[in-house]
Amino acid sequence: YVHTTFFKDKIKFLNFSSYLCATKHGFIAVMVKKELTEAEIAESIPDLWQPLTESQREFLAQNFTIQKYKKNETIYCEGETPMHLMCLLSGKVKIYKDGVGGRSQIIRVIKNKEYFAYRAYFAEENFVTAAAAFEPCTMCLIPMPVIIKLIQENADLAMFFIRQLSKDLGISDERTVNLTQKHIRGRLAESLLFLKDTYGVEEDQCTLSIYLSREDLANLSNMTTSNAIRTLSNFATEKLIIIDGRKIKLIDEERLKKISKIG
């Protein structure tokens, strides 16, 4: 799984990662080989690395693997047993749940250096959602038994996960209210602002740095694709946004905030 070679002043980790997951077209396994130093691991997962002792860092590094996913590839499926803590190093990921009639609801989106896929393990249950890559992604995977051992030994690390779960719960509560109590215009405006806050904008300071399909934007906003297309068109007519294919430029953010607030 992981081969470790010791040097005088540093440790190099040769990571061989093979992760098998189900997709509509069968199973996909991606083999990744990558050399990582302790400094590179520390840069990849700073929040996790910082509170650890030297011996704990060595133990974590020996169980640290890198995984790459293609665009639209499934990362984990609903009903699967959680095995790893995941941290997104590059790319964009959606957490979603399939609903009635084949429609999906995007529950949340993951940004760089964000940890996910661990709540179900703590709850001793299988995944109640699924995850997939919006675009090519690189992630680190750490076996959950390793995380549990470190938490039992390190109170600061335990507090880190308590804070993370608390923040995630707060975001989930806010999203639930927004998606169930707001009308279509308010939901779509909230989603556009949510994407800006999560992924930021490009150099022009207006264009969202994530290019979602109309279907994904609809699934994020709890509406049909046709409603998302129609509402986006209305926003463009009202000069709130500019649409260029999948690129969306926010022109009047203050009015979008008002629409989102009014609901």
Which stretches of residues belong to each language-model region?
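N-terminal amphipathic/basic-hydrophobic helices that include classical n-h-c signal peptides
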Residues: 1-30
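Phosphate-/nucleic-acid-contacting segments
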Residues: 15-18, 23, 197-263
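Cyclic nucleotide-binding regulatory module and flanking cytosolic helices
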Residues: 22, 26-71, 115-116, 120-122
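Cyclic nucleotide-binding regulatory domains
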Residues: 48, 73-136
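Cyclic-nucleotide recognition modules
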Residues: 56-57, 108-166, 170
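Short loop/turn motifs at secondary-structure junctions and domain boundaries
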Residues: 58-59, 75-79, 202
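Alpha-helix/helix-capping structural signal
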Residues: 90, 145-146, 167, 215, ...
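Polybasic "coupling" helices that flank or enter modular domains
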Residues: 152-222
